[in-house]
């Protein structure tokens, strides 16, 4: 039997970290087992579902690199199938029409809560019996599933072990609303059956739905899949994860300069582990992942840890991989890389100093864009009259260079220090500010090499003019 998992988000909001982790676990298990991964959009909530949210979910999945083998399927395009199964259950007396008005149900719910009783639908309540008896052909009705009254529902959760619920704890679930639309708990069963889903991986907030859904599987004669319910993700303060903890949409992490691999590596560790290992390649994730290794305990979201992972991948990933995602940030900042060094060379030089791709894009700017002003603090400290001789000598030497490479530029700087009998800082720091416009950069010789001879000459010339003007105004 082919293993088949699915990710089935509701498009009532963007793809957030909790949903992304669920998708990742489902995707990894399918890949690990040589199976298939299905993407399904559960858009039966017609009032809250939006095309914007659907687009954001698809974009987030694509950005993370979680490709799907089937789909995306849309529940709103399967209403005929759901109605077919509702009619079948009605014909088999496994479902029935309920004419009880919402106002009465709300009233009874309030009475139960006031009495400290778990709110649930009671088909035998006198008021409900009376409401159904008073119905006419024109009365509005919903369809309820006739849940078994005796026995228990038992299933072996792949994360939590054996779970057992008495049927007496479950009420008769609405499977079709008064407006004719099917409900979540019914649709998900039909979809998972039709799509051949063998393992359902989802959040622990769905545990209460599972016994209800299992009874529907049995009523329609469908095989029951295995279930794995993952613990919640909490903030680092133990509270429910929210925006202040970093619970933002996946695409916001892209916008803030995170690499997909860093986020995936972080998400897999939020509830799963393999010894003390922290860094996992995609191949390792797929080979090592198992549902049984998912923790039963809630995980705490730590933005600092995610940032550390992002820095790790910027430093160690193949420059071509980083460049693929850096390019988007460069374009957002209107940095044209057509006239300048290869992006991969810049990443190799600057990447180690950056925690995010935004920082990397900012640190890459001076390789591609000229500037008209120097960073004020750096210029005040280093572009002083005392630096004039060093910059002038470097300028004459670089203009005379026939081969533009890091080694020759290193010799230029070293020879300048020797001839002027000054330390490296007296030459290197003014030169760094001159060619980059700022006080911090990687090694100045390697930086100059990538900036290119023409730009270096022009910028040192501009720095000398800045010093001359400063001297004149002193």
Curated annotation (Swiss-Prot):
Per the Swiss-Prot or TrEMBL annotation, the motif 'HIGH' region is positioned at: 9-19
Keyword list (alphabetical) reads: Aminoacyl-tRNA synthetase, ATP-binding, Cytoplasm, Ligase, Nucleotide-binding, Protein biosynthesis
Q: Does the keyword Transmembrane apply?
A: no
Could you name the Gene Ontology cellular component terms for this entry? cytosol
Residue window of motif 'KMSKS' region: 240-244
Annotated localization: Cytoplasm
Q: What molecular functions are annotated in GO for this chain?
A: ATP binding; glutamate-tRNA ligase activity; tRNA binding; zinc ion binding
Location (main, coarse): cytoplasm
Top EC class, one word:
ligase
Pfam families associated with the record: Anticodon_2 (PF19269), tRNA-synt_1c (PF00749)
| GO biological process entries | glutamyl-tRNA aminoacylation
Enzyme Commission number: 6.1.1.17
SUPFAM superfamilies named among the record's database cross-references? An anticodon-binding domain of class I aminoacyl-tRNA synthetases, Nucleotidylyl transferase
| Catalytic activity from the UniProt record | tRNA(Glu) + L-glutamate + ATP = L-glutamyl-tRNA(Glu) + AMP + diphosphate
For ATP, which residues are the binding ones?
Answer: 243
Q: Which Gene3D superfamilies match?
A: 1.10.10.350, HUPs (3.40.50.620)
Q: Which family does it belong to?
A: Belongs to the class-I aminoacyl-tRNA synthetase family. Glutamate--tRNA ligase type 1 subfamily.
Cite the record's note on assembly. Monomer.
**Functional description taken from the UniProt entry:** Catalyzes the attachment of glutamate to tRNA(Glu) in a two-step reaction: glutamate is first activated by ATP to form Glu-AMP and then transferred to the acceptor end of tRNA(Glu).
Question: Protein name, please?
Answer: Glutamate--tRNA ligase
């Amino acid at each position: 039997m082919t293993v088949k998992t699915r990710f089935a988000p509701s498009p009532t909001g963007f793809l957030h970290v909790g949903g992304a982790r669920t998708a990742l676990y489902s995707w990894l298990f399918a890949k690990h087992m040589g199976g298939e991964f299905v993407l399904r959009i559960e858009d039966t909530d017609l009032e809250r579902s939006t095309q914007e949210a659907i687009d954001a979910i698809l974009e987030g999945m694509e950005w993370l690199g979680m490709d799907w083998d089937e789909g995306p399927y849309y529940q709103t395009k399967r209403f005929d199938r759901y109605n077919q199964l509702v009619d079948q259950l009605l014909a088999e007396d496994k479902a029935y029409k309920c004419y009880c008005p919402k106002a009465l149900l709300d009233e009874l719910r309030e009475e139960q809560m006031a009495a400290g009783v778990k709110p649930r639908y009671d088909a035998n309540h006198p008021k409900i019996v009376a409401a159904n008896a008073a119905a006419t052909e024109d009365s509005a009705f919903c369809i309820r599933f006739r849940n078994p009254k005796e026995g228990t529902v038992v299933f072996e959760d792949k994360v939590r072990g054996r779970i057992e619920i008495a049927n007496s704890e479950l009420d008769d679930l609405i499977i079709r609303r008064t407006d004719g639309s099917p409900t979540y708990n019914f649709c998900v069963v039909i979809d998972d059956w039709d799509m051949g889903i063998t393992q359902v991986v989802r959040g622990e907030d769905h545990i209460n739905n599972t016994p209800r859904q299992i009874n529907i599987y049995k009523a329609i004669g469908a095989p029951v899949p295995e279930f794995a319910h993952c613990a919640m993700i909490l903030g680092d303060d133990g509270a429910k994860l929210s925006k202040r903890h970093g619970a933002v949409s996946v695409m916001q992490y892209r916008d803030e300069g995170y690499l997909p691999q860093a986020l995936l590596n972080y998400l897999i560790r939020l509830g799963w582990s393999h010894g003390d290992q922290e860094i996992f390649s995609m191949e390792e994730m797929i080979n090592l992942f198992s549902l049984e290794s998912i923790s039963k305990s809630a995980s705490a979201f730590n933005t600092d840890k995610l940032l550390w992972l992002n820095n790790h991948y910027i430093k160690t990933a193949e420059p071509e991989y980083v460049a693929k995602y850096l390019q988007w940030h460069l374009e957002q900042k209107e940095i044209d890389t057509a006239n300048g060094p290869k992006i991969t060379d810049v990443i190799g030089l600057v990447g180690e100093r950056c925690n995010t791709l935004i920082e990397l894009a900012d640190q890459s700017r001076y390789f591609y864009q000229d500037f008209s002003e120097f960073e004020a603090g750096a210029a005040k400290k280093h572009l002083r009259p005392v630096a004039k001789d060093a910059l002038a000598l470097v300028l004459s030497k670089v203009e005379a260079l026939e081969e533009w490479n890091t080694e020759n530029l290193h010799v230029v700087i070293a020879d300048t220090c020797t001839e002027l009998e000054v330390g490296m800082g007296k030459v290197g720091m003014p030169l760094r500010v001159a060619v980059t416009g700022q006080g911090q950069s990687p090694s100045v010789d390697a930086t100059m090499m990538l900036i290119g001879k023409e730009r270096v000459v022009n910028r040192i010339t501009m720095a000398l003019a800045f010093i001359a003007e400063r001297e004149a105004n002193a």
